[in-house]
Amino acid sequence: MPAGLVVLVGPPASGKTSFVRALIARRQIDAEAVVSSDEIRAELFGTSPAEAESEEADARIFDERDRRIVARLATGRSAIAESTNVTPQARARLIAIARRFNAPVTMLRFNPAVTDLVQQYTERRRTDLTAEDVRAYATIMIRDAGADQLRSEGATTVHDVPGRRQATTPAEAAAQFSFV
C-alpha cells in the first residue's frame, strides 16, 4: 500500500485491532503509525467509563486522533486510523485531513458475518457495548460502507481484509498486505 492514510472500517470486534497487532508483530508497520481511538480513550480517561462515554469525551478523543494523524501526514509518514469508521461522517473527517496533505487514502474493510461478529464480541468480554450495539454497527457497515461507497467518498484504494468467515487468522490476513 502506498504511504498515506490507511483507514480501518469495521464494527467493534471485527478484527481491526488483531489485524494491526499482527502487522506490528510481523514488522510490516511501526506501532507509532497506528492511531487508535480506543487507546486515546484509555490515555485520556483511564478506566472511568462514566467520563469516557459522553459527547464531550468523544470530541476530545477524536480531536486528539486527528491531531496525531496530522502530525504524521505533515512529515510524510503514514498513519493508520484505527476506529470503527463505519459512517460516512467519520470517514469524511479523515479524508479531509488526508486531502490537506495530498495523501492517498486506503480503506481496509472488516466485514465479518454478524454471527461471527457477535461471537468475537462475546469472547472479548467487553462491557462498554452490548451485542445489540455491535449488531447496529454491522447494520450501518452494510448500509454505508460498501467498497463502491468508500471509493465515491474519496478512497484511493479499498481492500477487504479476510477474517474468520474466510478461515483466516489475523497473521495470515496481515501477510496479504504490504506497506510502503
Enumerate the predicted regions with their spans.
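Aromatic/hydrophobic pocket-lining residues that form π-stacking "cages" and hydrophobic walls in ligand
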Residues: 68, 94-96
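Conserved nucleotide-binding/hydrolysis micro-motifs of P-loop NTPases
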Residues: 39-41, 86, 111-116, 165-166
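Acidic, metal-coordinating catalytic cores used for nucleic-acid/nucleotide bond scission
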Residues: 82-91
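Conserved GTP-binding G-domain of TRAFAC-class P-loop NTPases and closely related GTPase folds
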Residues: 1-9, 14, 18-29, 33, ...
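Conserved phosphate-donor/acceptor-positioning beta-strand/loop module used by diverse small-molecule
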Residues: 101-120
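Conserved substrate/cofactor phosphate-moiety recognition/catalytic segment
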Residues: 17-77, 116-119, 123
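Loop/turn-to-beta-strand initiation segments
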Residues: 75-79, 104-106
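Conserved helix-turn-beta segment of the N-terminal RecA-like "Helicase ATP-binding" lobe
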Residues: 97-98, 126
